[in-house]
Amino acid sequence: KKGKMMVNETVREDVMDVILLVDAREVSAVGGGKDTPLEMSCRAAATYAKQLLDERNNVALMIYGESIERVDLDRGEHHLFKILTALSSAKPQGNLKLEIVLKDLLPYIPSGSPLILFSSLDDDHTISEAFTNTISRGYTITTVSPSSLDFEERMKRIPAQPLLIARIERDNLISEIRSFGMQVGDWKSDEAVNTALQGG
């Protein structure tokens, strides 16, 4: 009997509080239709939420754009439904910066909780600052980043030269985040989400 109790305690200790952050700013609508960074982020967040909840973790979802929509930490099948409902109604609007979002949220997030950010990392000059502030408080952030540049290239709206410069800037930003010791998946629109993180 004592042995059994120990097993349960070990399992209990392995349960994590995981925070999913989805970038739904206006800039996440590049591409149109089912293929936008926001659509990709929502699909990926749904996949992660299901997997984490299946493993009996507590999961919270924060969608930020014009404001922050929160689905607080919980677990179970009913909670997955709440998360999926919030993701399916996410609209690309507003331009809340990551640093402000995290400043608002961190006081409510249990310390040491892993954060998973789904964002194209576009058009946000606060990203480096947001990461360093968050990491210095003992949190880890894994980033799954659908590249909006793939969509731009397909739509041929941006000339080759500016597109190349944008790619270099994106690569530099990703390298900088990785230099903080954080994992970033540079997610191409034609690959599965788990491939992105293996590459990162």
Task: Show where each model-derived region lies.
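A conditional alpha-helix N-cap/helix-loop micro-motif detector
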Residues: 41, 95-98, 124, 166
